[in-house]
């Protein structure tokens, strides 16, 4: 029997069971748990390789064969870290398994035919497209920036650089909802718009959901009072949509307990639950003790570094229309920035008490850094606290990696009722996938696949004789062009809007998909991120304790996935 040494095998077909891969220049290492291939029957494309007629390619039509196969990829998802071929058919994930020609190869469950395209995944990591559930739609250029970072779904609100949008994630009113649905129809991105949820009577909220909102957003700048919270959640319960909330920093209409009481045990997504992005000062962080609260962070506080506190004050003054000449405005800003709660946020993420990470795009957050900041946090926690208990036996960071990737993939999908379509690499879901070379993981993807088509990729000089000559930069690919962008993307709306014939009335090209199962979930549904500690905050010192344990850590002086990768 012919054999190959492990290093040669990895160079030709990628890592296999038991091999370890470093993620970028972080201290996070993942180990291959399973390899779906049959040794000796691997498929690979190229001159003199396997995927040729009568060899790894069968004779069947695309009734049986897949449209696309990504060969020998290392899949990193919330459910595991495995090596395999990934089949894509009709823009959706067909299977993670063994590709090839069943006429001549064993254990083939992804059939390659003459109608099958190939993407070489050897030596690459494949992840689900990211979901950013805290978007201020301030400018359309955010979509390209997010896409090239590995995000394929954006949920939030806004109408452009209006003052309200720059502060709050709300697309206010039926007219603006319709116009934003039309404006984004041909963008290569899944989208969902949140209507304004601040009202004490239901009618104005109901009409927004019927006009295409996928949920509602409560924001303190519009008045997040107990009455508006109760009304908004009551409407959400009736329409099966999620509510996102930015609570009352100034504690004008009540304290954190007043807000939690107004929830009445109904599920809610709490934005920037640490508080620097806004929320009851100084103790909004304790909201994540509650099983009905789905807590997320925004990326400027991810992770805690020696620059974090300093950059936040000016950021906050601009985003919330404050005046540095007004003493009360400065005091308002100061009350939100606390190094103690930011440090605790790192640890709460690492232990799974905070469930999601998002951007807060151009409104105290960076739309292209959700993925990067997530893995920088994982690295910092590994450096400061070592392996998680769940990883001790393996000696690699598999559980930590699965915990952190869930924060920007499956968990926001579950929270907003879209996990039946996106959020993981599982059969039947949209083929929204991101391919990474391990050395560039979490900072520079090598390919972004949207609904089965390549939507964006680094590309060299279009006049060159090969694709790689400089200047190489991210460019839109065919999946971003023409009607394909709409055909490979969806917009999430309420079931009521879908049943109202909204697509036809607005003349939309893309498919509308209803959110569902948003009201029957809890934090226990947040995969790998469901810890419910009893959190307390000292009102004088801002010290944070979880089940009595003081949560504190030092700020990072340097981070991976940073200037090493972004010289230009």
Curated annotation (Swiss-Prot):
Modification N6-carboxylysine, positions: 217
Pathway: Nitrogen metabolism; urea degradation; CO(2) and NH(3) from urea (urease route): step 1/1
Enzyme class: hydrolase
Residues given in the record as Ni(2+) 2 binding sites: 217, 246, 272
Pfam families in alphabetical order: Amidohydro_1, Urease_alpha
Keywords: Cytoplasm, Hydrolase, Metal-binding, Nickel
Cofactor needs: Ni cation
SUPFAM superfamilies assigned to the protein according to its UniProt record, in alphabetical order: Composite domain of metallo-dependent hydrolases, Metallo-dependent hydrolases
The keyword Acyltransferase is assigned to this record: no
Protein family membership: Belongs to the metallo-dependent hydrolases superfamily. Urease alpha subunit family.
Name of the protein: Urease subunit alpha
The organism of origin for this protein: Marinomonas sp. (strain MWYL1)
